[in-house]
């Protein structure tokens, strides 16, 4: 890097490509002050509708079997270019995975301890657009109107979570993906409903702030939500219905992960999730027991009681 310090870095690709470019930017930033160099201009052009990395100061990089989250203001691109024609050829399975990642970003930013009026407004719009347009993208990738709406939703979700951060769905998904190479969006989709239920205290009083906010999302989706519990129930059903519509796996056991290997590495994944940088802003503070049970629920796909 010292011999060919760039003036411009362009990242053209999916979230992993943009995150890799961010790692380069981060490495350059460590030497820039001593060398008296300007930070390179950074242009991000996403070719999937998923991470929203083109507008965030986050980068996820893999070190051995662990995914590490970098957070630094230098990682925020200077220019983001959104072109829905670049995502028209994305296959249905990847469209589903990345689209559920968008939904997860919105849900987690919305109930984050760092949420604000600004991130809430973005997250609410994202949730509405995902349920309205993701199925159309999955059925017909050449539907550029649906593609544009999902591409915009991905970007808006990135804007929401770069300001509000995320929660334990991402913490658990980072560990699951790092250990068993489950695609990130798919890992989020497998864990999302279980975390929603746990954050809402669904099997308890179901009257947490998170439960009430989830119920508001259900109301915005024109689903039954006369009480927090009814709203959370509606949202959980809507999430599962969306996954089923796109033929997504219901449980980790449907993804090819070996049961014995899963049990053997469960404690390792829980430890990774506990120290993940997304965990502190989760609306409900988890411990190892809770995360272990959430993984076990996600293994079978059944939402059960978890304290």
Region locations from a protein language model:
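Short, amphipathic C-terminal "tail helix"
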Residues: 261-307
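Short glycine/serine/threonine-rich phosphate/pyrophosphate-binding segments
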Residues: 16-23, 52-55, 169
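N-terminal small/polar loop signature for handling phosphorylated ligands or for N-terminal nucleophile
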Residues: 1-34, 136-147
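C-terminal and late-domain segments of enzyme folds
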Residues: 96-156, 160
